[in-house]
């Protein structure tokens, strides 16, 4: 399947801005399941400097600077992406058990495991804590498949938390989300990662695009 993705980010300032410096990560990655065939980023007003690079995690970073006064900024990223079918087994009980994964994370010296251990560590918005471990611990029994346990945790968060766009900001701590049981997708992703890391598993945040299909007869 081929997709043409157009992502527009626009800022309108209350007063004139004399200078701005930005990093944009708006280009889909090429992975085993998808290929970014081509992409471009257009910015208005005119740029004084631009540079592209790949960061530590493999993301494409577009760095730019504007040195003229402006009251609005528009960044338009256009990408053509081809995806490949995913062959997935719907039996969630298959795969390694929670105990097997934890043992491998602790004992294996393989390159993949050593790289994965980085995602056991705390990050700026996600810190392991007893409250997150206790919230999920009963789901991750030793002999249960890790995949099944992760799906169960996703279902628990979906059932027990309310989607509320005004309840949080990008700086709201997870402890507050946990207490109020409200937030948005970013908060719930952070919560699930915190639960997994608090139990000793490796987990990381991935963002992207989801294709949505409207009800019959309605526009997309």
Predicted features, each with a name:
Residues 1-134:
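Linear, non-domain "peripheral" regions
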Residues 100-104, 109-183, 191, 198-199:
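Secondary-structure boundary elements
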Residues 54, 179, 204:
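Short glycine- and Lys/Arg-enriched binding-loop motifs that mark or flank ligand-binding interfaces
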């Amino acid at each position: 399947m081929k997709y043409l993705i157009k992502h527009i980010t626009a800022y309108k300032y209350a007063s004139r801005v004399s200078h701005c410096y930005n990093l944009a990560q708006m280009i889909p990655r090429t992975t085993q399941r998808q290929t970014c065939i081509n992409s471009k980023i257009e910015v208005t007003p005119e740029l004084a400097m631009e540079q592209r690079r790949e960061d530590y995690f493999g993301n494409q970073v577009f760095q730019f600077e504007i040195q003229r006064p402006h009251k609005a900024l528009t960044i338009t990223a256009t990408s053509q992406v081809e995806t490949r079918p995913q062959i997935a087994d719907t039996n969630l009980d298959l795969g390694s058990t929670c105990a097997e994964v934890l043992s491998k994370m602790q004992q294996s010296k393989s390159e993949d495991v050593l790289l994965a251990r980085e995602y056991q560590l705390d990050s700026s918005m996600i810190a392991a804590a007893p409250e997150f471990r206790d919230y999920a611990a009963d789901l991750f029994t030793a002999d249960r498949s890790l995949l099944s346990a992760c799906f169960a945790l996703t279902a628990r968060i979906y059932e027990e938390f309310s989607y509320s766009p005004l309840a949080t900001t990008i700086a709201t701590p997870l402890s507050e989300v946990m207490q109020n049981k409200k937030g948005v997708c970013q908060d719930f992703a952070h919560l699930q990662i915190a639960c997994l890391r608090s139990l000793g598993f490796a987990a990381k945040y991935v963002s992207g695009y989801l294709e949505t299909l409207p009800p019959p007869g309605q526009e997309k």
